Amino acid sequence: VIGTKPDFYKQAPLVVEAKREKLPVFVIDTGQHFDDILGFGIKEFKLEESVGCDLQIRGDLMEKASELILKFGSFGRFCKEEFGSTSKLLPVVHGDTLVAGIAPLAWVFGMGQKVAQNEAGLRSMSPEIMKKLKITQEPTLDLIEKYIQEQFDGKWFIAREEPFPEQIDTWICSAGTQYFFAPTQLNKDNLVKEGYPDEFVHV
């Protein structure tokens, strides 16, 4: 599944490798980045020849979100009617994008199955010292140096809300994911701590 510029670059290798392994693969393009500048990655990686479904999502963030759940869910329903609920179709979404947040939910509603996530387990972290800082506090040289040092020596905590909406998207995506493809061991550790089965999380 591709929708925005980051998707083109992160998902293109999956399409290339699937073809090399002679696995059946096609691209679902949400169409969010469709102009020549933002959409150049589709042409650059020759993804257009693999697009089997173009959802043509447009509008502002709320309009895109609403349209995405309706169209992606409807496509899932169509696939269920055509291929059955035990079909091996497996959408692979990417990272912490809007598509990653909404497509799994829509696919569960439409197809009755979960998805796979590329770049799974992305979680923002902040140093513990952030909790002690006050917005009204005047930044002194000592405070700045302490803040910098704490980033190296201090403990860190998972920040669920920032950046917004990316962190919401990736948390929601995890709940609708069956197979997790994590970029690092830290990302896998995040997912396992959250209760996702170790055997379904691959680094």
Each language-model region and where it sits:
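Helix N-cap/beta->alpha junction signal
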Residues: T4, T97, T184-L186
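Structural motif
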Residues: V1, I28, K88-L90, V93-G95, N118
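Active-site-proximal region of nucleotide-activated glycan assembly enzymes
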Residues: G112-V203
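Alpha-helix capping/helix-boundary segments
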Residues: H33, V99, L186-K188
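Hydrophobic/aromatic ligand-binding patch that stacks against planar heteroaromatic rings
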Residues: E17, A103-V108, I172-C173
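Glycosyltransferase specificity loop/lid
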Residues: V1-T86
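An aromatic- and histidine-rich active-site surface loop
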Residues: V92-G110
